[in-house]
Amino acid sequence: MAGKEIQTPDQAEAFVAKVFDVLDSYDYTRFGEVLSTDLKYEGGLQKTSGLDNFINDIKASTQRMPGLQTSHSRYRTELTAEGTIYSEGHSNASLESNPGKVVTVPMIGVFKLDSEDGKIKEMRIYKDRLPFLALHQALPGMKANN
């Protein structure tokens, strides 16, 4: 489903589910299915413009955190009359090197769609990044901040 076809909250939820399925796959060849080439992204400490720059930033992050696995769950998705999607849920992250440790934080996603191709043109993700610091410090060779 292209974003420009979204007219109901159920359609918005299905679209957001696909977005997180694509992002959590870390299959960068699929990112263009849901993200516009002129994407503007802001989340955590990251702010970037352009799909290629967004992908390069994600690649750099995953290189610093090998074996990173993420998933996202949603408990509420809202669609405004202007077509902006608000999604509330949780972001989960774990590392292959520490499979028993999963960090879960509340998250809000804001997605503005391109009226031409229905892909996400602006994406903002709000979540507390601090709990992920402990996960990062659990990586081999990293020093815990005691």
From Swiss-Prot:
Cited InterPro entries: NTF2-like_dom_sf (IPR032710), SnoaL-like (IPR037401)
Keywords assigned: Antibiotic biosynthesis
TM regions (residue ranges): none
SUPFAM superfamilies linked to this entry: NTF2-like
GO annotation (BP), single: antibiotic biosynthetic process
Listed pathway(s): Antibiotic biosynthesis
Described function: Part of the gene cluster that mediates the biosynthesis of sordarin and hypoxysordarin, glycoside antibiotics with a unique tetracyclic diterpene aglycone structure. First, the geranylgeranyl diphosphate synthase sdnC constructs GGDP from farnesyl diphosphate and isopentenyl diphosphate. The diterpene cyclase sdnA then catalyzes the cyclization of GGDP to afford cycloaraneosene. Cycloaraneosene is then hydroxylated four times by the putative cytochrome P450 monooxygenases sdnB, sdnE, sdnF and sdnH to give a hydroxylated cycloaraneosene derivative such as cycloaraneosene-8,9,13,19-tetraol.
Protein name: Sordarin/hypoxysordarin biosynthesis cluster protein G
